[in-house]
Structure formats: structure tokens, C-alpha cells
């Protein structure tokens, strides 16, 4: 097979034509590219932690963390450092190579940036890759996180530009693109994808992929989420998307962004093992690991490892911590046993 050429000039009709291929042809093309660019049996494993939950001012119609919807979600302040590090250690012990931290904000406040910078540094010291999703970032904020060593920043486009206004009205599509520009300019890696099953048309799924694939540099990681319908959100009663359309979206993402990690994100809890196996064959090679994604359910770790074993898959190996980092981590954990720390961070203490 000839070497895959990266493109940033995809036309909508080209991507729609990929979606329209017979399933066998689409899967063959996607898997061939996947096998050429990656170990087809390796899956990168990330753990996602909500470091600040609920009370978000945005009106994203899919999101239980919006303050505008009554979903029964209890809001929480920014987590204390030791709480985050305990979760990160647990994630590493369970086999995760990347630790992702998410906050329900429109954008981070300047008063919190020093604390977030320290959080990145502390998690990095455990020998893990780091990722954050905090909302919109200014160029200065992106540089601060990059200086701390943050590896990835997630900011999804969610859907096509045409359908976007039916999903969100409190932030523009361009503002999302601007944040991605700031992240890339800072030197961090970009994690950006979207959500399917929000009532969009097939052309909107093609439009989402087109926007991602036509970025000046493809996202390093492309999370594809299946809508998790949460009671109290405007999208709670939408019809289910045909699961095969989800597989098609994974396959087209793989074809158009051949060197990117394509992640199975939200919605896996409701997917059969057979559907997930098709997604891995179609080019997905990353998952979120653990029983919860921010506030929505996710398969248990043991279920994922059992599925990996049945499919002959293995997780990507994490970054090994140095001996000095291991000793520092153990010393900090031992010291923590002698004092009880608060569960939440107090910004006023800075």
C-alpha cells in the first residue's frame, strides 16, 4: 500500500462519499490505513477526572454540568491537589498512560492558573502524560500550561458549523477554533473531536470530520463521543443513532486523519462488545478507562481488560517515572498519611 499522504483540503462531498461507501469497503480502507500507521493491536488508555464539577454557565444541550438544566448533579469546587494525585496514582496503577483533568468552566480564571500549573507538574512527576480540558484558553493561558509541561489540551468542536447553533448558543464555533490555534501555538498537542447522535444529519457528521481534518495540523487525538442522554438536558429524548453510523464516523476519521489517535469516548457504557470491536477494527486506538467520564458512566476497568484479552489487544505502555520521581512520590504519600487534607481547593488561600 502506498504511503499515506496527509491532507488539509478535504471537500465535504469527498467525506460524504466515504460515509456512503459499502461498509466492507469502508472498513477495509480504514483498517488498511490504521495498520500502516499504528500497531493495530495497541490501544492508548487514558483516565479522565472531573476536577471541578457542575455550575457551568454554558448552554450545551447535551451537558449535565450546565447550570441551566436540572439534572440532579451536585456541583463541586476545584478538587484539592492530593485528591487529584491520589486519583492519578490509581489510574497509573490500573494501566493508564495518560491522565486527563476536566473542569466545568467557560474558561479558567486567572486566579486558578498557578494552581493548575502545579497540578500539571505534580501529575507529570508520577510519570504520566497529562491532558486538561478547561474551556476556552487565551494565548497566555495556553503558554502557562505548556510551560508546566501539559502534553495535551482538549477542546472539542462538537459538530458541524451548520448544526452548531442547534447545540450551543453561548460560545461561537470560531471561539473553539481560536482556542485550538492558541493551544497549537503554545507547543501543546491538540485533542479535538465531537459528539454524534445529537439529532444531526449525516452531512453534519461529515462536516465535523471536515473541520478537524482541514485544520492546519491534524489533532493529535480525536475523541469521538456517542451522545449520552441525561435526564434534564434538552437532548434527553432524542432518538438513538444507528450504531453502524458511529462505526462509519470512526472509520472516516481514521481515513482522513491517518496519523491521529482516534478515541472511543463517551457512550461506551451503552455499546456492545461487538460494536466496540468493530470500532477498533475501523481505526479507534484510544479509550477512556474507568467507571466514570466526568459525570457519565463508563465501563469498569475489569470489563475493558477482559475485552482487550478477548480481542488480543494490549494497552500502550506508559512513561516510566525516574527513580527520583518514584522516591519523591512515595515520600509524599507517606507524609500524607500523617495529616488529613481537605477534599477541595480553596482559591482564596492563594
Curated annotation (Swiss-Prot):
Pathway: Cofactor biosynthesis; biotin biosynthesis; biotin from 7,8-diaminononanoate: step 2/2
Gene Ontology biological-process entries: biotin biosynthetic process
Cofactors: [4Fe-4S] cluster; [2Fe-2S] cluster
Cofactor binding remark: Binds 1 [4Fe-4S] cluster. The cluster is coordinated with 3 cysteines and an exchangeable S-adenosyl-L-methionine.
Keyword field contains Cytoplasm: no
Residues annotated for [2Fe-2S] cluster binding in this entry: 100, 131, 191, 263
Function: Catalyzes the conversion of dethiobiotin (DTB) to biotin by the insertion of a sulfur atom into dethiobiotin via a radical-based mechanism.
Protein's recorded name: Biotin synthase
Gene assigned in the entry: bioB
